[in-house]
């Protein structure tokens, strides 16, 4: 068994949280894409790990797709609890991306909390809309926003991995079912506004999967 109790870092210098509380890390992915839903994940890691593999957990952007998938499965196996939430393209267009991101985060928190309660949220970023999961008696679940938290807190890094792996699988499934999306190179760019994606929008217009209120999509 491997311990990472207290405030000491893991092998990668990441901070683990207090041993007397269950603290959840929360992160989102695809906030800036032109296509598909925004995804969030909430992860509570154990205070004692079954092995040293947790030391490989780090910001998902620094991992290959194959490694992210491997670590996402590991995280889901060892986590005290975890949840994934999303907000649809329709919700994004109706209430804007910030509010849709909050909905995705709240849904991820809900899914995790109903399986195992926890005491606090660590949110990647600078803003979070306070929230009370079903079953919590107090007014709001305690939370703290941490800029670039996926680079410093193990639980947030774990959430970033789970969210990004979920989003990758969603995009791959979407393209498999709707091969016309290959015109936009969605499997490669994951929905982000790369030059080839933008050129395809100019040439072919937008699909039902595009966010109608985003950038160039507003004019197509």
Which sequence ranges carry the predicted segments?
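RNase H-like, Mg2+-dependent phosphodiesterase core
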Residues: 1-220
């Amino acid at each position: 068994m491997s311990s990472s109790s207290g405030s000491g870092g893991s092998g990668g210098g990441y901070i683990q949280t207090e041993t007397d509380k269950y603290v959840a890390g929360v992160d989102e992915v695809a906030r800036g894409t032109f296509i598909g839903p925004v995804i969030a994940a909430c992860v509570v890691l154990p205070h004692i790990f079954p092995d040293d593999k947790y030391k490989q957990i780090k910001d998902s952007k620094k991992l290959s797709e194959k490694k992210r998938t491997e670590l996402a499965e590991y995280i889901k196996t060892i986590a005290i609890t975890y949840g994934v939430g999303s907000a649809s393209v329709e919700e994004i267009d109706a209430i804007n991306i910030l509010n849709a991101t909050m909905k995705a985060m709240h849904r991820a928190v809900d899914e995790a909390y109903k399986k195992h309660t926890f005491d606090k949220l660590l949110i990647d970023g600078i803003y979070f809309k306070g929230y009370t999961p079903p079953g919590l008696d107090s007014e709001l679940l305690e939370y703290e926003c941490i800029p670039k938290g996926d680079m410093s807190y193990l639980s947030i890094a774990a959430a970033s991995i789970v969210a990004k792996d979920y989003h990758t699988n969603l995009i791959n499934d979407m393209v498999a079912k709707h091969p016309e999306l290959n015109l936009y190179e969605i499997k490669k760019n994951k929905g982000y506004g790369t030059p080839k994606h933008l050129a395809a929008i100019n040439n072919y217009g937008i699909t039902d999967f595009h966010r109608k209120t985003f950038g160039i999509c507003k004019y197509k």
